[in-house]
Amino acid sequence: MPESRTSADGGMETSYGFREVPGGEKQDLVNQVFHKVAKRYDIMNDVMSMGMHRAWKDAMISALNPRKEPGYRVLDVAGGTGDIAFRIVEASGRQAHATVLDINGSMLGVGAERAEKKKLSGNLTFVEANAEELPFEPASFDAYTIAFGIRNVPRIDAALSEAYRVLKRGGRLLVLEFSEVDMPLLDRIYDAWSFNAIPQFGKAITGDAEPYQYLVESIRKFPNQENFAAMIRQAGFSRVTYTNYTGGIAALHSGWKL
């Protein structure tokens, strides 16, 4: 489970990669990371996943199986560039409406530009807000998705509680996230790739290795599959399951509001 600690001044601390920082400071630090990589976010995911994130996202959309009917509403959190939302809308035959929520305006700007180019603006709403305090009424959405974003939220338990609140009864939560590799040889290979190659590739692509170093460290600090599934259950979700992708490099977690 993610740990929060009390700092010397009495405030709560949380992990920012391998560092411990005041809870209120983590969000600002994460915002700086994604402001730096916003325009190269897809390339960043290619580097982080060795190109496999596209197949994982396709599997996520297949698992969601969005309904092909008007009125089907999905909230995609930490989805600023629109990658998941675009896939959902297309999979629904352009019937679904996706609300893309992100705390980072730079990421949302990239997503809005892409939506216009894809002629999907009518199916999308872009909202700048915090996953821990969603600006929506209870029971507003049929599905809640978040891909490679939950580990960057300072209070994951609060984000999961908010997900439960805004879902309709019968609504589904899907969380795609880097996870704990469960194959002995693969874990060593991926560790070597993560801590040696990824920051250097990031520096070559963006001129700055630091954001990539944080992202690698944040994966190691994130709860493993069983512990994160327990957090989802604790938030109130039922029928909680997870599916490992590529030996556990990533995992898709699913839960229902019943």
UniProtKB/Swiss-Prot annotation:
It holds the Pfam family Ubie_methyltran. InterPro entries: SAM-dependent_MTases_sf, UbiE/COQ5_MeTrFase, UbiE/COQ5_MeTrFase_CS. CDD domains: AdoMet_MTases. GO terms for biological process: aerobic respiration; menaquinone biosynthetic process; methylation. Residues 1-21 are annotated as: Disordered. It is an enzyme of class 2 (transferase). Keywords: Menaquinone biosynthesis, Methyltransferase, S-adenosyl-L-methionine, Transferase, Ubiquinone biosynthesis. S-adenosyl-L-methionine binds at residues 81, 102, 130-131. It catalyses: a 2-demethylmenaquinol + S-adenosyl-L-methionine = a menaquinol + S-adenosyl-L-homocysteine + H(+); a 2-methoxy-6-(all-trans-polyprenyl)benzene-1,4-diol + S-adenosyl-L-methionine = a 5-methoxy-2-methyl-3-(all-trans-polyprenyl)benzene-1,4-diol + S-adenosyl-L-homocysteine + H(+). GO terms for molecular function: 2-methoxy-6-polyprenyl-1,4-benzoquinol methyltransferase activity; demethylmenaquinone methyltransferase activity. Its EC number is 2.1.1.163, 2.1.1.201. Pathway: Quinol/quinone metabolism; menaquinone biosynthesis; menaquinol from 1,4-dihydroxy-2-naphthoate: step 2/2; Cofactor biosynthesis; ubiquinone biosynthesis. Methyltransferase required for the conversion of demethylmenaquinol (DMKH2) to menaquinol (MKH2) and the conversion of 2-polyprenyl-6-methoxy-1,4-benzoquinol (DDMQH2) to 2-polyprenyl-3-methyl-6-methoxy-1,4-benzoquinol (DMQH2). Belongs to the class I-like SAM-binding methyltransferase superfamily. MenG/UbiE family. This is Ubiquinone/menaquinone biosynthesis C-methyltransferase UbiE. It comes from Rhizobium leguminosarum bv. trifolii (strain WSM2304).
